Amino acid sequence: MAEGFAANRQWIGPEEAEELLDFDIAIQMNEEGPLNPGVNPFRVPGITEAEKQEYCNILQPKLQDLKGKIQEVKLEEGNAGKFRRARFLRYSDETVLSLIHLFIGYCPHLCRRHELGSLRHDIDIEALQEERYNDREKGITDNIKYGKRCLIGTAVLYLLLSLGIIIHTCKAQVVWRLPPLVVPVEESEIIFWDCWAPEEPACQDFLGAMIHLKASTNISIQEGPTLGNWAREIWGTLFKKATRQCRRGRIWRRWNETITGPLGCANNTCYNISVIVPDYQCYLDRVDTWLQGKVNISLCLTGGKMLYNKETKQLSYCTDPLQIPLINYTFGPNQTCMWNTSQIQDPEIPKCGWWNQNAYYNSCRWEHTDVQFQCQRTQSQPGSWIRAISSWKQRNRWEWRPDFESEKVKVSLQCNSTKNLTFAMRSSGDYGEVTGAWIEFGCHRTKSKYHTEARFRIRCRWNVGDNTSLIDTCGETQNVSRANPVDCTMYANRMYNCSLQNGFTMKVDDLIMHFNKTKAVEMYNIAGNWSCKSDLPPTWGYMNCNCTNSTNSGTGIRMACPRNQGILRNWYNPVAGLRQSLEKYQVVKQPDYLVVPGEVMEYKPRRKRAAIHVMLALATVLSMAGAGTGATAIGMVTQYQQVLATHQEAIEKVTEALKINNLRLVTLEHQVLVIGLKVEAMEKFLYTAFAMQELGCNQNQFFCKVPSALWERYNMTINQTIWNHGNITLGEWYNQTKDLQQRFYEIIMDIEQNNVQGKKGLQQLQEWEDWVGWIGNIPQYLKGLLGGILGIGLGMLLLILCLPTLVDCIRNCIHKILGYTVIAMPEVEEEEIQPQMELRRNGRQCGMSEKEEE
C-alpha cells in the first residue's frame, strides 16, 4: 500500500503531517463545541526525529485523506460533516444513558452496552461519501430506538405503581388523632375537678382565669352523666378545702366518745367516734364567708374533660360562678323540692312536706328575701368593769368586759325584723345530730368612729328559755313535749332577744367536726355596744309553705298550725342544692382518636403540624368549624387545620384583653392555666407515643395510616354504606363505630405491651449507663479540664491528618481564581531522561529565547 501511495500521491513528511493534524483538530473543535479531539503526536514533548518518521509511516493514509479533503471538499454551512455526525451520536448516547440510569438502573446498560451508540455504515469504504444526512437516517441509531422504548416502559411502570398506590390508599384505614368532637363520658370514668374563687385562699390552688372562654354550638350530644352525679364528692371536697386551714391550725379540744346501742355494747352495737373541735377563730377568719355562700365559686374540670351546658348549648372548662353554702340554712339559694315522697330514692333530695305534731307543711314555694334584720348588743354576764385608757381629749372611763373564759357567759343580742316571719321550727339542725332550732342571718357592721368594720354570722336559738324572754318560748301554746313549738313568729319592728349559738357539729366523711363559737364574741368585740344590719346575699330567699292541720286524733296535746303559712327552718340542703345547680352541666371529653377511611387523606390540607393548645380552644374549633348537625366529616377535615391556625391568635386576644383591664393577677393565672392545659394536651397526645411510632406516625401528625396487616388482623373493616363518602356527621360516625375505636385501642395496648424494640432500647440504655456511669463521680472542674485536653488533642490530630488535603484545596482554589489550568504530566523514569532532550512548549524549544529561535 505504501508503493501505491508513492506512485499516486506525494509523501507527507513530519512538518506537513503536524500541520494537517493541527487542521484536523481545529475542525473538530470548531464544530459545535469540543468532541475530545485528542493530542497532536508530533507536538508531544521530547519526541525524536525517528519517532516522527515512524508516526508518518503509520498515519500516512490518514494524512493523505486529510490532504485530499482540504483540496476537494468545500466546507459549507449546510454540510454537517462527519464530526458533527459523530458528535450527535455521542450526545444522544449520553442522553439515553442518563435516562437509563435515572429510570431503570445501570444493570441493563451493562448487559447491552455493545448495542448503544453504534453507527450503521462501513467506515472502510473508499468511495467519497455524501456528508448530508436526513432525519430518517439520524433516527435509525440504536440509542434513539432504545431511548423511546425506555421512555414508554418507564411511563407504564410509573402508571402501574400509581394505580397500586391508589388502590392501597383506598383500602387503608386512617386514625384521626384528637378530632374536633366531644362525646359524653362513661359512668365508670373518673373525673378530676377543682374549684376557682377569686381571693379565696382555700381555692387558689387552681387558677381558672379561662372560665369565660366559651363558644356557642348547636352540636347534639347524647345523654351522659352530669356533674350533679358527683355532688356528694364535690361537697365533701369543698368542705375539706374550706376547713383545711382551720384543721392545720390549733385544735380547741379533742375527745373520744362511745355511743351505745339499745342493748349496750352487745352484738357490736357500740360506735367509737373521734370528735375534733377546731379553733373557731380560724373558721371565722377563713371560712365564714364561704359557708355563707358569699364567695362565687366555679367548679372546673381537669384532665382534658369539659362541661357542656345543656341550657345555653355552650362548652367550657368551668361552671358559671355559683354560691355554694356548705351547711343547712333557713335562708339560702333556690332549691327545687319533690312532692311525691314515695318516689324519692335519694335521701339528699329535699322533701318539702313534713309533719310536726298535727301540723302538716306542704305546697312549699321559694320566695325571694326582702327582709332585713337589725341587731344590737348592750350587756352580757358574767364579767367585770375595767378602766379604759383615755386620751387628752377624753376623760377616764370604765367599760364592761365579759368573762370569755367562763362557761356561764351567754351572749344575747336584741334583733328586730322588717317583715313578719313565721318559722316552722323542728328539731333537725345542721348536718349531723345537733338539737335545737337555729335561725341564722349574716350581719355586717360598717366602720365608724368607735367601731371597726366587722362581719358576723348570727345564729339564734329561739326555743331556750323560761318564758321570761320575749321569744325564747317562741309560742303561746303550753305543754308541748318532744317537739319544738310551731308558733314561732317574729313580728316586724319588734325587738327580740337572740341567744347566740356557741357551736355546732358537722360530719364530713368519717370525721366529725365541732366548731366552737365562744371565741367569736371576743374576736369581733360583740360584748361592747354593737349594732348591724343584715347582709344576706341578694339572690337568697326562703321556703314558704302552707300549713294544714291533721285530722288524726292522738293522745296528748299536739301542736296545730298557728298560721296558714310558715317558713321551713334548716330547709336548704347543701348537697341537694349543689346537685341541682350542677345537673345542667354534662361532662364531655374529646376522643383520643377516631378511625376513619383513607378517603379523608385526599381532603387533608398540606399543613400537618399540630397545635399543642388544641384542648384549650376546642370550643373555638367547634364553633368556627361548624360541628353541628349540618357539618359532614369531610367538611370537618377540610376546615380543621384552618381552625387550628387561629388558636394562638385567640389566646393572644384574651391575654391582651386581660392586660387592658389591668388584671395582672388574672393575667398571671391565665398564663399558668394555659401552661397547665398545654401539659395536659401534651400528655394526652403522647399517651400512645410508642404505639404511634410503631404505626409510622409521629406526634406532629393528626392523620395516621394503620398498616393493612393490623386492621385485617383485628377485623377493622369500615362499613362504606354508613360512611357514605363522608356525608355523615362526626358525632354519628363516632356513635356507630365505637367497636372500631375499641379495636384500635386493643392494637395500641398490644403494641405497648409487646414493644420488643422498646425493651431493647431500655437494655441498651442500661448497658450504656453502666459503661459511662463512672463519669458522674468525677468532680465538675476535673470534667472541664479533661474535656479541654481531649478537645485540644483531637483538634490537633484532625489538623495533622487533614493538612495536605486542605493545602491542595486552597491551591486549586487559587488556580481557579487566577485562571490557571493544572495539567497532569506523565511520570518518566530517571534513567530515560537525557540532558540533550529538547522540550517543546507551544511550538518552541525549551531553553531558547524567542530571538535565538528566530
Curated annotation (Swiss-Prot):
A cellular component annotation (GO) from this entry: membrane
Region of interest: Fusion peptide: 614-634
Residues spanning the signal sequence: none
Keywords of the record: Cleavage on pair of basic residues, Coiled coil, Disulfide bond, Glycoprotein, Host cell membrane, Host membrane, Host-virus interaction, Membrane, Transmembrane, Transmembrane helix, Viral attachment to host cell, Viral envelope protein, Virion, Virus entry into host cell
Post-translational events: Specific enzymatic cleavages in vivo yield mature proteins. Envelope glycoproteins are synthesized as an inactive precursor that is N-glycosylated and processed likely by host cell furin or by a furin-like protease in the Golgi to yield the mature SU and TM proteins. The cleavage site between SU and TM requires the minimal sequence [KR]-X-[KR]-R.
GO biological processes: symbiont entry into host cell; virion attachment to host cell
Extracellular topological intervals: 1-783
Disulfide bonds: none
Annotated coiled-coil segments of the chain: 641-691, 734-770
Cytoplasmic side: 805-854
Transmembrane regions listed in the UniProt entry: 784-804
Region listing for Immunosuppression, in residue ranges: 660-678
Main function: The surface protein (SU) attaches the virus to the host cell by binding to its receptor. This interaction triggers the refolding of the transmembrane protein (TM) and is thought to activate its fusogenic potential by unmasking its fusion peptide. Fusion occurs at the host cell plasma membrane. The transmembrane protein (TM) acts as a class I viral fusion protein. Under the current model, the protein has at least 3 conformational states: pre-fusion native state, pre-hairpin intermediate state, and post-fusion hairpin state. During viral and target cell membrane fusion, the coiled coil regions (heptad repeats) assume a trimer-of-hairpins structure, positioning the fusion peptide in close proximity to the C-terminal region of the ectodomain. The formation of this structure appears to drive apposition and subsequent fusion of viral and target cell membranes.
Subunit (UniProt): The mature envelope protein (Env) consists of a trimer of SU-TM heterodimers attached by noncovalent interactions or by a labile interchain disulfide bond.
Name under which the protein is recorded: Envelope glycoprotein gp150
Originating organism: Feline immunodeficiency virus (isolate Wo)
